Amino acid sequence: MRYIMQHISKLPHYYSVVPKEIINFATFLNQNRKNMKAFVFPGQGAQFVGMGKDLYENSALAKELFEKANDILGYRITDIMFEGTDEDLRQTKVTQPAVFLHSVISALCMGDDFRPEMTAGHSLGEFSALVAAGALSFEDGLKLVYARAMAMQKACEAQPSTMAAIIA
């Protein structure tokens, strides 16, 4: 923990807890909970054909954000997300923006009555968490995710690789 705290970028707001005992940590969480909501966002691998289509068809806000994303990306990612092939959706350069968009737009469409007090994300999901928390704009988050996806796509094309997951 000391190493992490010394080497992370200094953000304007962050909080960490190092419990002396697990029971103390559980007590802390129980005493400070007060109906708090937390959103946890997935990383790459959570994609599926049809993701976000219901939101697009039933929410004016979602439709506006998806169309804004199409403009920012310079192509209609919604066509791939809603009706594309699984193979097209699995390309890193498509997958990462698609998962980000589905996660963020789902969270933003929940309305002000259901805003989280805490957000977290796994890998790619960290960007979704930052946008859902209001620390990063939708537009900037999408641009960062797309740049990341393109860099990772290029690296994968230069050096073919795979990812393995261990489920215990």
Predicted regions and their residues:
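Short, Lys/Arg-enriched N-terminal segments with co-localized hydrophobic residues
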Residues: Y15-N35
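N-terminal amphipathic/hydrophobic targeting modules at extreme N-termini
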Residues: M1-I8, P12, K20, A26
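Alpha/beta catalytic cores of group-transfer enzymes, especially the acyltransferase/condensing modules
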Residues: Q44-A46, L73, A133-A168
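Helix-rich "cap/lid" substructures immediately adjacent to catalytic or cofactor-binding pockets
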Residues: K37-A120
